[in-house]
A protein has these predicted regions:
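A short, glycine/acidic-enriched catalytic loop
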Residues: 223
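Cell wall/extracellular polymer interaction/catalysis modules
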Residues: 2-217, 226
């Protein structure tokens, strides 16, 4: 794919961007990207989504689009070329990168199973609650709410587990739009961002996630959704 590099005089027009080939930038979601995913075009056709702060290498500009090589996070997309309309690239990339590189999440059981009413699900759920501490803040989570014999799920086993980068939209199997829409605009952002968990002693996604909601199928599900 031939691309060009705008190295002429600086463009001072409002909303403009000067494309610098070889520059590293990071993805940024717009206010309208409420779920937390930014739609990008794939080289060769089709589209995909990336989350905030994905590391991108600027390849250049062609026909009103800015092209990037994905350098981080989305394992299935690393090394691939994606593009944005030039006017969107103004809003959808930034140079600073993430302020915090990593975080440790410590989860501690808070007693045994209890039945609690969920205002979102409008019914009683049998929950295994825990407290998740992240950056000094304590957040209520549920580790399971669907039990045998009706279901085969169970709480995550104790251990030191790795939190992986978000993989894809989970709207189909676990739409969380209702939680976001229950609060004033802007209270909950990126509700569709799920973080896979690599269990201690295993490799790759265990199909357990850190995500928000009131129903857990063995995930670390953030019950205090507004936090």
């Amino acid at each position: 794919m031939p691309v060009t590099n705008n190295r002429g005089s600086s463009n001072q027009s409002s909303g403009s961007i000067q494309v610098v080939k070889g520059e590293v930038v990071y993805s940024n979601i717009r206010p309208q990207d409420k779920d937390g995913w930014l739609l990008v075009a794939l080289e060769g056709g089709g589209t995909n989504n990336i989350h905030e702060n994905v590391k991108l290498l600027t390849l250049g500009e062609k026909n009103g689009r800015v092209y990037y090589k994905i350098l981080s996070d989305r394992r299935d997309l690393i090394g691939k070329t994606v593009s944005l309309k030039k006017e969107n690239a103004v809003l959808c990339t930034h140079k600073a990168g993430p302020v915090q590189k990593s975080a440790i999440l410590k989860v501690t059981y808070s007693g045994g199973r209890v039945d609690e009413y969920s205002r979102f699900k409008r019914g009683m759920l049998s929950q295994q609650f825990a407290i998740m501490n992240v950056n000094g803040a304590n957040i209520k989570v549920t580790l399971n709410s669907a039990w045998p014999p009706s279901f085969s799920y169970s709480p995550i086993i104790p251990g030191t587990h790795k939190i992986m980068a978000p993989d894809y939209s989970h709207k189909v199997e676990g739409d969380t739009t209702g939680y976001r829409d229950a609060f004033p605009l802007g209270t909950i952002r990126c509700n569709d961002i799920w973080f896979p968990i690599e269990l201690e002693g295993t490799k790759g996604n265990s199909s357990r996630y850190v995500h928000l909601g009131n129903v857990s199928h063995g995930c670390v599900t953030v019950y205090d959704v507004e936090k």
